[in-house]
């Protein structure tokens, strides 16, 4: 996954998130409350600022539109934002309200209390005019738009309506993280991402089962004239309902949750980037689910980077397979490939006997892995090897060959086939990249036409001279004869 070419216009309520860490060791003599002995303080952008931070951490670029006060927290916020390469500060300063500041007091890795500094003043006409001007000035550079509504005033009706209408006129998708119960305010959005509670409040419908989630999402979708609703469901994962199609569920992976602060920001950031890169919403949902899984395991308003998201996707794959077996069945391999493709990953395929692993094999596997995001290796089973190589082969049985192959870092999955060629397996899996050694001509590669017809490609990898299993066996036999 590479999001470096994607720019997201982030519009919404920005705030300064302040975390004050301390220790609670006694009860106050003045009242029955704990005494917090203060230690270090950490500050970071929150609200739509955290959305932008997540976009940057995932490798994208962000343009940030919101309101800040002419005050010390506002200066601190802009100072933090100025330290982030890839971020364009399009914030509007106002003297009518303070910068929103949320201070969380933390002891023993738990929030003790939160103190909020904010104004309940409605958005003023001059503030709305300035925000709309900032949107108009920067939307031409955006590939996707995110509206992050924390119900703090920035996402007033005129701002929302203008942002969505302007984006739609340019063919730019708009993703909305809602706070309002009136989803009609987000009319025309491409995708709205409520949590389950927000979806229930917006529709007045139950959301306990998958069927109820779908019914509520369709009701919300109709009110907002939206293309899709993606509902986050905490430990139940996520549910995507699109205007055309049924409900799609991705489960959450069991983990220890330290802090859910800002998890919704991570979801919409990852979702928008993935969709902006060309993934379907279903594929983007898998990426967003993995990113959220990373940040809830961290304390405070956190972000996830690409390496963490890929590792989480791998862990989810392993969970779905019930562990990490050395050798997958054909059905398991097909399921695994489908999951990888749903995540927008390019799946590579190579095959062979791989009887005695040598440096030439490793070089081939490394080249194959460089050509894709996930590599599946198909091994000839023992009977197939014997037909191809003779009755004395294989030297190592399939189970041993699979264990060795699965332990090689370039390999993501191993499957076996019993036919003389892997053609039927290739038809089943439909890899994006088919890799063979450069000793083959393109017209000699089994399955090349199948892969190309499906939009994939064939890669011929260079081989290392003088490296082969047959030669290795010959040297072993010669050495054994010399010892006798």
From Swiss-Prot:
<dbReference type="GO" id="GO:0033786">
    <property type="term" value="F:heptose-1-phosphate adenylyltransferase activity"/>
</dbReference>
<dbReference type="InterPro" id="IPR029056">
    <property type="entry name" value="Ribokinase-like"/>
</dbReference>
<dbReference type="GO" id="GO:0033785">
    <property type="term" value="F:heptose 7-phosphate kinase activity"/>
</dbReference>
<dbReference type="InterPro" id="IPR011913">
    <property type="entry name" value="RfaE_dom_I"/>
</dbReference>
<comment type="function">
    <text>Catalyzes the ADP transfer from ATP to D-glycero-beta-D-manno-heptose 1-phosphate, yielding ADP-D-glycero-beta-D-manno-heptose.</text>
</comment>
<keyword id="KW-0067">ATP-binding</keyword>
<dbReference type="GO" id="GO:0097171">
    <property type="term" value="P:ADP-L-glycero-beta-D-manno-heptose biosynthetic process"/>
</dbReference>
<feature type="active site">
    <location>
        <position position="265"/>
    </location>
</feature>
<dbReference type="InterPro" id="IPR002173">
    <property type="entry name" value="Carboh/pur_kinase_PfkB_CS"/>
</dbReference>
<keyword id="KW-0418">Kinase</keyword>
<dbReference type="Pfam" id="PF01467">
    <property type="entry name" value="CTP_transf_like"/>
</dbReference>
<dbReference type="InterPro" id="IPR023030">
    <property type="entry name" value="Bifunc_HldE"/>
</dbReference>
<dbReference type="Pfam" id="PF00294">
    <property type="entry name" value="PfkB"/>
</dbReference>
<comment type="pathway">
    <text>Nucleotide-sugar biosynthesis; ADP-L-glycero-beta-D-manno-heptose biosynthesis; ADP-L-glycero-beta-D-manno-heptose from D-glycero-beta-D-manno-heptose 7-phosphate: step 3/4.</text>
</comment>
<feature type="binding site">
    <location>
        <begin position="195"/>
        <end position="198"/>
    </location>
    <ligand>
        <name>ATP</name>
    </ligand>
</feature>
<comment type="similarity">
    <text>In the N-terminal section; belongs to the carbohydrate kinase PfkB family.</text>
</comment>
<comment type="pathway">
    <text>Nucleotide-sugar biosynthesis; ADP-L-glycero-beta-D-manno-heptose biosynthesis; ADP-L-glycero-beta-D-manno-heptose from D-glycero-beta-D-manno-heptose 7-phosphate: step 1/4.</text>
</comment>
<keyword id="KW-0511">Multifunctional enzyme</keyword>
<dbReference type="InterPro" id="IPR014729">
    <property type="entry name" value="Rossmann-like_a/b/a_fold"/>
</dbReference>
<dbReference type="GO" id="GO:0016773">
    <property type="term" value="F:phosphotransferase activity, alcohol group as acceptor"/>
</dbReference>
<dbReference type="InterPro" id="IPR004821">
    <property type="entry name" value="Cyt_trans-like"/>
</dbReference>
<dbReference type="GO" id="GO:0005524">
    <property type="term" value="F:ATP binding"/>
</dbReference>
<keyword id="KW-0808">Transferase</keyword>
<dbReference type="InterPro" id="IPR011914">
    <property type="entry name" value="RfaE_dom_II"/>
</dbReference>
<keyword id="KW-0547">Nucleotide-binding</keyword>
<comment type="similarity">
    <text>In the C-terminal section; belongs to the cytidylyltransferase family.</text>
</comment>
<feature type="region of interest" description="Ribokinase">
    <location>
        <begin position="1"/>
        <end position="320"/>
    </location>
</feature>
<comment type="subunit">
    <text>Homodimer.</text>
</comment>
<feature type="region of interest" description="Cytidylyltransferase">
    <location>
        <begin position="349"/>
        <end position="484"/>
    </location>
</feature>
<protein>
    <recommendedName>
        <fullName>Bifunctional protein HldE</fullName>
        <ecNumber>2.7.1.167</ecNumber>
        <ecNumber>2.7.7.70</ecNumber>
    </recommendedName>
</protein>
<dbReference type="GO" id="GO:0005829">
    <property type="term" value="C:cytosol"/>
</dbReference>
<keyword id="KW-0548">Nucleotidyltransferase</keyword>
<dbReference type="InterPro" id="IPR011611">
    <property type="entry name" value="PfkB_dom"/>
</dbReference>
<keyword id="KW-0119">Carbohydrate metabolism</keyword>
